[in-house]
Amino acid sequence: MSLVLLPAVDVVNGEAVRLVQGEAGSETGYGSPRDAALAWQNDGAEWVHLVDLDAAFGRGSNSELLAGVIGDLTVKVELSGGIRDDASLEAALATGCARVNLGTAAIEDPEWCARALAKYGDKIAVGLDVRLVDGQYRTRGRGWVTDGGDLWETLARLDRDGCTRYVVTDVSKDGTLTGPNLELLSQVCAVTDAHVVASGGVSTIEDLLAISSLVDQGVEGAIVGKALYAGRFTLPEALAAVSG
């Protein structure tokens, strides 16, 4: 099975942006989210990773805009950002996206997350935003600002609750073009049977091939953002490289 690539469209105040290490205020603008998403679709993407960063940081919402973008696409969409309760979850699923990503809520509200997983199954992925703190992998919430506890304890709980897919981001790598954290991905795959989607740090085709080498361990896909926008490689080049 070949690695699935998910080009990212991160949205702030109606514009497609990229952050550096997930920090508000570090945005670089790239224009219309609709144009960005359609460009990835035209380049051969099977998935688009669409993120409402205003909702993720708790400072607003681009939900109507993103619902419109999803309606204009024929490819599958993974929708993320600010999905924290029944109303926001149902609104997200009603856009027609193929699946949603839960982030902060999976850390802060385990009971609600467990109910959501039981009800919607593999339409839900859980985003695990991770930072190495004093030699220990810790999860992060609220737009990567708050500590969410030990990664391995969090994973064990989510596995028990029936999570089938994790989107794993090393926050120290995201938006930096410094290469993915292959060790972290491998360690996560070793302790869960769920699918793993890698996020953060991809800067070269070689990085994607390195992630591709973990497919047999359980890595299903990779989210690619800044490297594409910065022109490090094109999506068709990346798709060709990992399809081998």
UniProtKB/Swiss-Prot annotation:
Catalytic residues of the enzyme: D10, D129
UniProt xrefs under Pfam families: His_biosynth
Entry EC number(s): 5.3.1.16
Transmembrane domains' residue ranges: none
A GO MF label: 1-(5-phosphoribosyl)-5-[(5-phosphoribosylamino)methylideneamino]imidazole-4-carboxamide isomerase activity
Superkingdom to which the source organism belongs: Bacteria
Keywords annotated in UniProt: Amino-acid biosynthesis, Cytoplasm, Histidine biosynthesis, Isomerase
One GO cellular component term noted in the UniProt record for this chain: cytoplasm
Pathway where it operates: Amino-acid biosynthesis; L-histidine biosynthesis; L-histidine from 5-phospho-alpha-D-ribose 1-diphosphate: step 4/9
Compartments it resides in: Cytoplasm
Single GO biological process annotation from the record: L-tryptophan biosynthetic process
Catalysed conversion reaction: 1-(5-phospho-beta-D-ribosyl)-5-[(5-phospho-beta-D-ribosylamino)methylideneamino]imidazole-4-carboxamide = 5-[(5-phospho-1-deoxy-D-ribulos-1-ylimino)methylamino]-1-(5-phospho-beta-D-ribosyl)imidazole-4-carboxamide
Family: Belongs to the HisA/HisF family.
Name used for this protein in its record: 1-(5-phosphoribosyl)-5-[(5-phosphoribosylamino)methylideneamino] imidazole-4-carboxamide isomerase
Organism listed in the record: Rhodococcus erythropolis (strain PR4 / NBRC 100887)
Name of the gene: hisA
